[in-house]
Amino acid sequence: MVSVKIISQEDDMITVLFKDSDRALLNAVRRNLMGHIPKMAIDTVRFQMGTYDQCVKCEHLNPAGVARRTAGGTGCSKCEAAFEKEDEDYIVWETNYAIPDEMIAQRLAMIPVPTDIEAYSFEESCPDCKDLVDEDRGCPTCNMIYTLRAFGAKGGRTITARDLTFLGDDSGNVPEAYRDIPITTLHEGQMIELWATARMGYGVNHAKWSTTAGVTFEPRQIASISNDKRAKILFDMGLRISKKDFKDGKLEDVHKVSDLKKDLSLIHI
């Protein structure tokens, strides 16, 4: 009977030992880990396009030219401040940046967002959406909405996953470990505004829904000392593994065996 033992476990990595198994079973486990575990991921992105005059006083965005005194405007639509001089009364922002929208959408899709399989459903099985056509599906029970509004700066400003805002409680925010993932760079006069919708999916359909990366397996190997004199020569070369790691002439620790193999391969080179 197959037995499973956890060798090591960290926040983002786990090593498992399978006994009495074969490659076919392990490959099936690998494929299921990568492609058949439900995960939330950004699937659609709506970009807001246009040019805006931002009020220096209240920071409100007005449609370009509408509020300017030279165009017959009456000022900011929020605080009614007069728009007479650019950079003094208002700042012009345009949704124009170097990276295409399609590439930004792809980057957003690959940013890990929290997955709560108990709080969210697949759109296909959502109680409120399952009977609707695909175009009409999407509700708070099966979708997570993120917004992004960011402005450039002189010399350039990198926009990251930290700038994404989840429309809900803090549990939906991008995890701290991934908040520095870059999305694009904005320069003076450039801005970006978008709404991103995340939904549940499987990695078999797209990599953005894959819950794991780099799932591999290899036969377990055990290192043994057959010649103490020759082994001493190796240990004197500053390997990460020493003789004290061997018990009864054998090294069974999976990670230490891997380190020994890497060290020996470098010596061979």
Question: Which ranges hold each PLM region?
Answer:
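Protein-protein interaction/assembly regions in multi-subunit complexes
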Residues: 1-59, 68, 72, 76-266
